[in-house]
């Protein structure tokens, strides 16, 4: 899977929204995000920039970018967000609502949390 820098920043924006949706940020959630960004070969010095720009990106711009991605990229984003939501073992209603909303706005494929986790594990 390939993403350009702006796409990664948009994904980071959504990932940040997901980890803060329930009002608490767990170490497991931040670890999943770090692992995925590094998996794409992003140098450690660029990770900080992507992270900070993702936090600052307007949600409407992030959803616009993600909505223009290919079907496979969208499947990855849906699975990534679902995995972030599930990794701490506690799926909060606010996280689930955000996942559904982002999926609807961006045209992400519908999948269960189980399918999201399996997809990410299979593509690790």
Write out the residue ranges for each language-model feature.
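Small-residue-enriched hydrophobic alpha-helices in membranes
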Residues: 1-124
């Amino acid at each position: 899977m390939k993403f350009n820098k702006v796409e990664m920043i948009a994904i980071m924006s959504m990932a940040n929204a997901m980890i803060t949706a329930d009002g608490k940020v767990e170490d497991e959630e931040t670890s999943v995000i770090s692992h995925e960004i590094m998996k794409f070969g992003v140098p450690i010095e660029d990770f900080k920039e992507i992270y900070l720009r993702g936090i600052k990106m307007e949600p409407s711009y992030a959803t616009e970018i993600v909505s223009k991605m290919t079907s496979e990229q969208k499947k990855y984003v849906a699975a990534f967000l679902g995995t972030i939501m599930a990794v701490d073992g506690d799926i909060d209603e606010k996280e689930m609502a955000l996942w559904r909303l982002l999926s609807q706005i961006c045209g992400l494929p519908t999948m269960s949390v189980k399918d999201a986790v399996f997809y990410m594990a299979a593509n690790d």
